[in-house]
UniProtKB/Swiss-Prot annotation:
HAMAP family: EF_Ts. GO terms for cellular component: cytoplasm. InterPro entries: EF-Ts_dimer_sf, Transl_elong_EFTs/EF1B, Transl_elong_EFTs/EF1B_dimer, Transl_elong_Ts_CS, UBA-like_sf. Belongs to the EF-Ts family. Keywords: Cytoplasm, Elongation factor, Protein biosynthesis. One of its GO terms (molecular function) is translation elongation factor activity. Residues 82-85 are annotated as: Involved in Mg(2+) ion dislocation from EF-Tu. This is Elongation factor Ts. Coiled coil: none annotated. PANTHER family: ELONGATION FACTOR TS, ELONGATION FACTOR TS, MITOCHONDRIAL. The gene is tsf. Pfam families: EF_TS. Associates with the EF-Tu.GDP complex and induces the exchange of GDP to GTP. It remains bound to the aminoacyl-tRNA.EF-Tu.GTP complex up to the GTP hydrolysis stage on the ribosome. CDD domains: UBA_EF-Ts.
Length: 283
């Protein structure tokens, strides 16, 4: 169990739905590599498709806006330490100033933005008493752009062609809810497809069926896999009887690209070992 922390076991349980002992065993066999442990658990049938990593640990806000000309849009993530500060008027105003600069300069150069706003950030940190960070910026250009904010924690920016404002808004809401990773199934990178294909072949071969039958089974599973992680292949949240691709076809529209930000995604919270803290304090 050296190097296999309780936090790692907990994360594996949350991502796979498997029991604690199965997760411990899988992590030991994978030498603490959680992604390898998930692959092995899927191959052995202990876990189905696992949830993506991305524990939300930071607080903050997402800002989303399209420029006045309608041809340029941006998302900005601004982080702080507590939910209380995320609602502070000064913090929100600082975020709006950053967004205004992004739209004015038409830039996603995060380092240049940080340098530009460092004095203002430092002053705000001194006033509020929490660290503040301009974490990331994304920009899109296109004929038709639209945004959607779910609270201030999830933001989506969509670039489309041949779509009206309402359709773009509905697509953006779908992206917020369903978290697609790519626009179309054919956009899924070859290495991602190959990785999943190998897992599915290992699972299919365990059924004892001939290889050619297993390959046919896997073809169907792979079509499902690429469809589920791509926008056009997903069932539309507002009408699951059709896919987003069907909806776009009905409206003679096309999605060029999209970006989805969620506050803190990918930032892992450093969890203190409470027992160790108490022991240290008693020395």
């Amino acid at each position: 169990m050296s190097g296999i922390t309780a936090a790692l076991v907990k994360e594996l349980r949350e991502r796979t739905g498997a029991g604690m002992m199965e997760c411990k065993k899988a992590l030991v066999e994978a030498n603490g590599d959680i992604e390898l442990a998930i692959d092995n658990m899927r191959k052995s049938g202990q876990a189905k498709a696992a949830k993506k990593a991305g524990r939300v640990a930071a607080e903050g806000i997402i800002l989303a806006e399209v420029a006045a000309d309608g041809k340029f849009g941006a998302l900005v993530e601004l982080n702080c330490e507590t939910d209380f500060v995320a609602k502070d008027a000064g913090f929100i105003a600082f975020g709006k100033d950053v967004m205004a600069a992004v739209l004015a300069d038409k830039t996603d150069d995060i380092e240049a933005l940080k340098a530009k706003f460092e004095d203002a950030r430092t002053a705000l940190v001194a006033k509020i008493g929490e660290n503040i960070n301009i974490r990331r910026v994304a920009i899109l250009e296109g004929e038709e752009l639209g945004t959607y904010l779910h609270g201030a924690r999830i933001g989506v920016l969509v670039a489309a062609k041949g779509a009206n404002e309402e359709l773009i808004k509905h697509i953006a809401m779908h992206v917020a809810a369903s978290k697609p990773e790519y626009v179309r199934p054919e956009d899924v990178p070859a290495d991602v497809v190959e990785h999943e294909h190998q897992i599915q072949m290992d699972i299919a071969m365990q059924s004892g069926k001939p290889r050619e039958i297993a390959e046919k089974m896997v073809t169907g599973r792979m079509n499902k896999f690429t469809g589920e992680i791509s926008l056009t292949g997903q069932h539309f949240v507002m009408d699951p009887s059709k896919t987003v691709g069907d909806l776009l076809k009905e409206n003679n529209a096309e999605i060029i690209n999209f970006v989805r930000f969620e506050v803190g995604e990918g930032i892992e919270k450093v969890e203190a070992d409470f027992a160790a803290e108490v022991a240290a304090m008693s020395k």
